[in-house]
Structure formats: structure tokens, C-alpha cells
């Protein structure tokens, strides 16, 4: 079965619909958790793998050097159905579960995490609407992403509010049937190319108001008067991704674009991460797997003292540790995705997966450069880019320190509940 765009493959939608009931429980065995893949999942995984080898890897270095947004890749991925496949079926999407979309994310990240982030960030922007939008909002804003290759963006981070979301200063004031937004956002992925944004703004000016009631989520059109993207940031890695600041000056948003209602924004924003952190972890695994493959290949070819360096125990142990990191990280994202697909809150497992995969990706990338020696420090070899690309995984969608904070709080809450 070829995963084609839903407009070109009505038969695919019918087949996915028929198999959805089975897919929803495909990871459950009589003895507990099972990660056996369905035929549909294997075919999507293979499609993403083929697309990565043929379309992404050959041009990844070019986009890294130019910093251009990979629109040609985005359009091809959209045509094949490698984008937006988590959009609900009643809107016309495939409504694939988190586990299945993570399979695709890992394969795409193997080729270039900058390009994968450009694809995945659109999913991050869409998720608040998928989780909390009403029928009209979903049809209007998710529907257009199925009609043509457009992307969305998640607009929350600010110059003074990253991990501390409660520090957001962007404000929205209600005036008649509209809300007027003023403020500045920072480090917004897809900031300059998005068709629309999910925006979190403070709607209760009382500094004593708890975050759970102080913020509201809005859908904001890119062409809204007063909305101005800044320059594209020149980042260390993942340069194919478009990252910018966004300025809001008296941006008027109709009341129809409020998600759920006033004061519900913080819950929406945080709930989004339970869905999106597993794909981020899967992306880190894709990068780590690429590092391991490149390092192993090089170690078998490069000779010192008359033998391939792979024969030296020091290198063997490094490769073994890299394999351990890849496999444990893969298991972690699979468990976190499986949990949310079972309808259970997965914050604990999602944070473990995101934190562990990010840390392992950075260590594995560093070890890959070490195995390459002087060549690893040169941009003509792939591991130099991989090491630069890896760092952001410890930062975006919640730093590794924030993930550890979430994990520890979950542990404390569980311990108190058992006392």
C-alpha cells in the first residue's frame, strides 16, 4: 500500500479506517506491552525510509550550508502523505496514532533533523487545534493543510519565557468581538513560513492568577495586520529549519479563533507536549542511528597499525555504547507513544524518552566525531553536521533539565499517592 496524499488516495483512507480499530490495540499483547508493527506501519516506515534516502540525504548538506527553507522537500513529503497524517479522519486526514507518526519521524530525522524539524514543527502547531479545536476551527485550519502544502507554527516561547511558560508577557485584551494581541515571541520554528500560528497569550493581567487560568490559546492568521516575523536566526545546527522572532502589534483576532475558552491556554499548551515529545525523541533516535551507522562504516574502513580501527577495543567499546544508547532511546520513545495511544497521560514517559534520547544523541554524535578523528572535525564528512544538529534536542520542546524536573515531580506524586 502506498501512502499517498489523502486527496489522491481515497482507497487509502478507507483502508486506514478499516484497520484503525486493530491498530489502536496493535501494541497490546496478553502479557503486556508489545511493539510489533502492523503491515500498514511497516509500509509507512519503508516509505519514509525510501524518501529519506532518495530525497533528503542527497541535499541535506546543501540546505545546511544555504540555510534555505526546504520547500521542495516539504511539497514532496506532502504529496506522499508524510505530512499531516495525524489530522482527524472527519477532517479528511488519516488520523494515525502517535506511535505510527513516530516511526516516520525517526526515518526522516536519519536524513536531516533540520528538515525533519521543519516537518514536525507544523505538527506541533497543529496539535493544539487537534486536541482542543471545535469542528469549525478544525475544518478551517486543519483542512487547508490537507488541500495544499502549507505549514503551521507553535508560537509560545518569548525572549524572557522559555521553560518558564508562566513568565509569558504577550497579552491579549478583549475588545468587543475581538481580541487584540501585543507582545513578542522568540525562537518560533516555521516562524517565517507558517500559514497560521497557535499563540499563547496572557489574558488575565493579575500577576497572582495561576498559570492554569491566566493564559488563552488563539489561532492567528499569518497575514494578520500587525503580525511581523523577524529575520531568520543563524543557528548552530538544524539550519534548514526556519526559526524567527514574531512581533504582535495590535493584532486583532476574532473571538471565533479562541481555543476552548478564555483561560484554557496553559492546559492546551502543556497537553500538546504529551503528544509531540515522543516524535521529538524519535527524531533524536534517527540522528543517533545515523551517527552509529556512519561511525561503524568508517571504523571498518579506516586503518591504523595495520588493521581497521574497529578492531581496537577502545573503538569497539565506543561503538557498543553507541548501540546501547540508540536501542534504549528507541524503546523509550516507543513506550511513551504507546502510553498516549492507550488514552493514558504519558508526561512521565514522554519526558524520560525526550530527555534520554536527546542526551544519548549528543553523546553518540560526539563519539562519532571522535571515531572519525580529524576528519570528523571537517564539514566534508557527515558527522560534523550531525553533532551540530544534535544539540538542540537538549533544548527545544523543554530542556533536558525541565524533563528531569517533570520526571521527579511525577515520582514524588506517585510516592505520595502510595503513602
Swiss-Prot record:
GO molecular function, one term: medium-chain fatty acyl-CoA dehydrogenase activity
Functional note: Medium-chain specific acyl-CoA dehydrogenase that catalyzes the first step of mitochondrial fatty acid beta-oxidation, an aerobic process that breaks down fatty acids into acetyl-CoA and allows the production of energy from fats.
Oligomer and partners: Homotetramer.
Catalytic activity: a medium-chain 2,3-saturated fatty acyl-CoA + oxidized [electron-transfer flavoprotein] + H(+) = a medium-chain (2E)-enoyl-CoA + reduced [electron-transfer flavoprotein]
PROSITE patterns: ACYL_COA_DH_1, ACYL_COA_DH_2
Top-level EC class: oxidoreductase
Cofactor(s) this protein cannot do without: FAD
Taxonomic path: Eukaryota, Metazoa, Ecdysozoa, Arthropoda, Hexapoda
Pathway the protein acts in: Lipid metabolism; mitochondrial fatty acid beta-oxidation
Family indicated by similarity: Belongs to the acyl-CoA dehydrogenase family.
Organism of provenance: Drosophila melanogaster
Primary localisation category: mitochondrion
InterPro entries given in the database record: Acyl-CoA_dehydrogenase, Acyl-CoA_DH_CS, Acyl-CoA_Oxase/DH_mid-dom, Acyl-CoA_Oxase/DH_mid-dom_sf, AcylCo_DH-like_C, AcylCo_DH/oxidase_C, AcylCoA_DH/ox_N, AcylCoA_DH/ox_N_sf
Effect of a null allele: Defects in fatty acid oxidation results in a significant increase in the medium-chain acylcarnitines C6, C8, and C10, which is further elevated under starvation conditions.
Effect the entry attributes to changing residue 347 to A: Prevents phosphorylation by Pink1. Does not rescue climbing and flight defects in Pink1 mutants
UniProt keyword list: Cytoplasm, FAD, Fatty acid metabolism, Flavoprotein, Lipid metabolism, Mitochondrion, Oxidoreductase, Phosphoprotein, Transit peptide
Name used for this protein in its record: Medium-chain specific acyl-CoA dehydrogenase, mitochondrial
Subcellular location(s) of the protein: Mitochondrion matrix; Cytoplasm, Cytosol
EC annotation from Swiss-Prot or TrEMBL: 1.3.8.7
A GO-annotated cellular component: cytosol
Keyword Flavoprotein appears in the UniProt entry: yes
Any one GO BP annotation for this protein: fatty acid beta-oxidation
Presence of the UniProt keyword rRNA-binding in the record: no
PTM text: Phosphorylated. Phosphorylation at Ser-347 by Pink1, may contribute to regulating levels of acylcarnitines and amino acids such as C3 acylcarnitine, beta alanine, arginine, lysine, and argininosuccininc acid, but does not appear to be required for function as a acyl-CoA dehydrogenase.
